[in-house]
């Protein structure tokens, strides 16, 4: 996504690192670049607002559950694959079969 306007920091870079900004996982100097970008780019600001709302909703609904570290690492790895344009292996996308599901013979 791009608004088509030139910016000091490109829209694609902002969107690629949006969750790092939302989660406060980036240096202050980078945060300043993001804030400046949002001041001049309404499409990115809108996307930021939407993702911020989703994050708050998830926290409110699921905030009491601890996420295992290995699950977080796996999800972040998959997000990195997606952001880099690589495809996620099909076996990682499909739901694992339930133990109560009937077995085919």
Swiss-Prot record:
Keywords: Disulfide bond, Metal-binding, Redox-active center, Sporulation, Transcription, Transcription regulation, Zinc. GO terms for biological process: detection of redox state; response to redox state; sporulation; sporulation resulting in formation of a cellular spore. It holds the Pfam family zf-HC2. Under oxidizing conditions up to 3 disulfide bonds are formed. A single disulfide bond inhibits binding to SigR. Cys-11 forms a disulfide bond with either Cys-44 (the major bind) or Cys-41 (a minor bond). Its cofactor is Zn(2+). Changing residue 11 to S: No sporulation, constitutive expression of trxCp1, no binding of SigR. Residues 94-105 have a biased composition (Low complexity). Zn(2+) binds at residues 11, 37, 41, 44. Disulfide bonds join 11-44. Changing residue 38 to A: No inhibition of SigR, no diamide induction of SigR. Residues 33-47 are annotated as: Contributes to redox-sensitivity. Disruption phenotype: Viable, but defective in sporulation, white color. Strong induction of disulfide reductase (trxB) and thioredoxin-2 (trxC) that is not further induced by diamide. Acts as a SigR constitutive mutant. A double sigR-rsrA mutant sporulates normally but is more sensitive to diamide. Binds 1 Zn(2+) per subunit. Zinc is not required for SigR-binding, but is required for anti-sigma factor activity. Zinc-binding renders RsrA relatively resistant to oxidation. Residues 86-105 are annotated as: Disordered. GO terms for molecular function: sigma factor antagonist activity; zinc ion binding. A quadruple Cys-3-Ser, Cys-31-Ser, Cys-61-Ala, Cys-62-Ala mutant has anti-sigma factor activity and is induced by diamide. Belongs to the zinc-associated anti-sigma factor (ZAS) superfamily. A redox-regulated anti-sigma factor for extracytoplasmic function (ECF) sigma factor SigR, and a key sensor of disulfide stress. Holds SigR, its cognate ECF sigma factor, in an inactive form, inhibiting its sigma activity under reducing but not oxidizing conditions; oxidation and reduction of the anti-sigma factor is reversible. Mycothiol (MSH) is competent for reduction of RsrA, allowing it to bind to SigR. In conjunction with its cognate sigma factor SigR may sense the intracellular level of reduced MSH. Probably releases SigR during oxidative stress. Interacts with cognate sigma factor SigR under reducing but not oxiding conditions. Treatment with the thiol-oxidzing agent diamide inhibits the interaction, while incubation with thioredoxin (trxA) stimulates the interaction. This is Anti-sigma factor RsrA. It comes from Streptomyces coelicolor (strain ATCC BAA-471 / A3(2) / M145).
């Amino acid at each position: 996504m791009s608004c088509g306007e030139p910016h000091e920091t490109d829209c694609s870079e902002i969107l690629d690192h949006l969750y790092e900004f939302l989660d406060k996982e980036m240096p202050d100097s980078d945060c300043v670049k993001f804030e400046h970008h949002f001041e001049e780019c309404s499409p990115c600001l809108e996307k930021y607002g939407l993702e911020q709302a989703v994050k708050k909703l998830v926290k409110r609904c699921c905030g009491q559950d601890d996420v295992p570290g290995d699950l977080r690492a796996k999800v972040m790895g998959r997000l990195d694959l997606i952001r880099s344009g690589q495809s996620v292996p099909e076996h990682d996308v499909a739901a694992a079969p339930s133990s109560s599901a009937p077995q085919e013979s």
